[in-house]
């Protein structure tokens, strides 16, 4: 394992209007550890790649880029980015979302560092439209505490995708990710969550 603490896995397809805000929210994180940003573009046609290139040139030590030659409908783009993740912990950020707390990563990393039995930690988030108008008070329905199989069976999630920081499966000996590679067993987020739950606790923190 290298000294990268967190791999921020960014996924974009025609997100040009939102891309800078998403990346700036990652770059504004205040941390005492090293992190990397991996941006996977799924053959965008709206100028997203120009924006990505500008950030990669400006932050060459932080940002890695992966460009799909043809649109993969997410599948290969997600796979290639996750395979490139070298951090001890991993978090996804689809680039039409963004983070609002500059201490977000530090808070979640500190929690996982202090709780070795915990494999993932999430938190609530506010849902907004493309004009930043709030659509919902928060997401998900799990306010805080341990996320359990009873929640999974009801279709509830511990947090929206970009709130979930988890231990990199590459470095977790007892974590079987084979179900994640079975596309007939449900959406990718749910498959990954189910696999993570077999290897440790999933916790939702009481903040947005």
Predicted regions and their residues:
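Acidic helix N-cap motif at the loop->helix transition within catalytic regions
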Residues: 18-20, 46-54
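Cell-envelope/extracellular polymer assembly enzymes that use nucleotide-activated donors
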Residues: 4-7, 36, 191
């Amino acid at each position: 394992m290298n000294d990268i603490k967190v791999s921020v896995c960014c996924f974009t397809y025609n997100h040009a209007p939102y891309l800078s805000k998403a990346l700036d929210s990652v770059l504004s994180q205040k941390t005492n550890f090293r992190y990397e940003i991996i941006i996977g573009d799924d053959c965008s046609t709206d100028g997203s790649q120009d924006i990505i290139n500008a950030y990669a040139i400006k932050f060459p030590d932080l940002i890695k880029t992966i460009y799909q030659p043809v649109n993969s409908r997410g599948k290969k783009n997600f796979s290639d980015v996750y395979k490139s993740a070298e951090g001890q912990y991993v978090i996804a950020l689809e680039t039409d979302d963004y983070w609002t707390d500059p201490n977000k990563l530090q808070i979640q990393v500190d929690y996982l560092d202090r709780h070795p039995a915990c494999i993932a930690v999430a938190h609530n988030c506010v849902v907004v439209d493309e004009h930043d108008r709030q659509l919902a008070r928060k997401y998900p329905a799990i306010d805080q505490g341990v996320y359990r199989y009873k929640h999974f069976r009801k279709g509830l999630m511990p947090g929206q995708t970009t709130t979930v920081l988890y231990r990199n499966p590459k470095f977790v000996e007892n974590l079987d990710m084979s179900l994640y590679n079975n596309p007939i067993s449900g959406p990718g987020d749910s498959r990954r969550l189910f696999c993570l739950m077999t290897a440790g606790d999933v916790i939702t923190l009481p903040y947005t």
